[in-house]
Amino acid sequence: MGQDREAMEHDCKFNTRLLHGETSKGYGQREILPPISQVSAFQYESMEELERVFTHKSMGYAYTRIGNPSVSAFEQKINELEGGAGAVCCSSGMSAITASLLAICESGDEIIAGTGLYGGTIDLLHDLEKLGIHTIFTKKLDKTSLTGLITDRTRVIFGELISNPSLIVMDVKEVSEAAHEAGIPLLIDSTTATPYMARPIELGADIVIHSTSKYINGGGNSIGGIIVDGGKFSWNFEKHTALKEFKKYGRMAFSVRLRTDIWENLGSCMAPMNAYLSYIGVETLGLRMEKICDNADALAKALDKEPDIEVNYLTLPGHPYHGYVDSQLGGHGGGILNFRAGSRERAFKIINSLKYAVIASNIGDLRTLVIHPASTLYLRSGREETEAAGVFDDTVRVSVGIEDKEDLINDFLSAVADSRI
């Protein structure tokens, strides 16, 4: 049976692997789903036993801030989906990005990042400047730009696989090759792609981050983040001095420092209930993403026929990153599209006229969500920085849900038509 299961895990498709993989074999009392360990601490029969857990001589849990069975089950599930060597859950996607960068960088170090990042991530990178960690932004992450930007202080290349909301697609193979030639790891936020569309570690990335609050959870009922370490990067401990103390762990030095030092001391733990809710949510990821991507494609093509609407979606034939849909994203365009309405006033009018789109700041929900990003998500960013991220005063971002696509199309086309009056 063990050999049969191993063969199945290599040969089966996404949804089967998701439901019947290594992490779905049952738990302590043979539960189908991991139970919720909603506790602060764990008890032991003797002080010696607890000491062995604290000194990592025995497996076990002591305090939920540093480990919890419900959270571990979710970590293992996502780690398996991404093909990683280890994963750490965090309280949010922003917490995951923060912990990852602080585990690699220290004062005086540099990060190279794409400009098309989520507004909150840009704000974080500016905050890290106050700690002496400098970010060099580049309009396009590719081999040519990296060659001219990498210095002896560069410690990590960071970007989104599909940027939100500008929909710039990173060529992971090209960027990872350029990074590795310089002895630098590639850290990717793959929230908008999800493991359904792409597995960045297989493409060459070293570390993958998700805001699990989005597509992985899928129901908009919990906040969380996760960091997956591919365990393949050969760290130069003379260059990456933040990891020098963890040299004995070799290629897993990042993961060990992350879990036992930065993550633990920042208090970045995921709540057990949130882990449980996201574990349930991720099991329908394939079904949801198939429907979401189909809806987004249909809605984008319908809106693209409107003469006074400028639509941005990856499957549109003229899109500059259209080629990556098949080569890197499994034939899918994802769940986000955006369009320019011509003015801020018209953008607001369209948003306010929609019947089946909820005005909210999340993405990846079952419901279609809509927002004016310039006045919300990029409120703290300057105009130049906001426009570099592909966000303009007339931009409307749409996170497409699983509604019937005919209803969505009719709703958006009606709102666009009404906005002309």
Residue ranges and their predicted role:
Residues 1-60:
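N-terminal glycine-rich, Lys/His-bearing helix-loop that initiates the first secondary-structure elements
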Residues 2, 12, 85, 126-127, ...:
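PLP-dependent enzyme catalytic core of the Aspartate aminotransferase-like
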Residues 9-15, 21, 69, 364-365, ...:
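Positively charged, small/polar-rich N-terminal and surface patches that mediate targeting and assembly
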Residues 41, 46-98, 120-127:
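Conserved N-terminal alpha-helix of the aminotransferase class I/II PLP-enzyme fold
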Residues 41, 229-233, 341-345:
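Short loop segments at secondary-structure junctions
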Residues 59, 85, 223, 274, ...:
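Short amphipathic alpha-helical segments
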Residues 2, 6-10, 15-27, 87-306:
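Conserved PLP-enzyme active-site core in the AAT-like
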Residues 304, 310-396, 400:
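Conserved C-terminal alpha-helix-loop-beta "cap" of PLP-dependent enzymes
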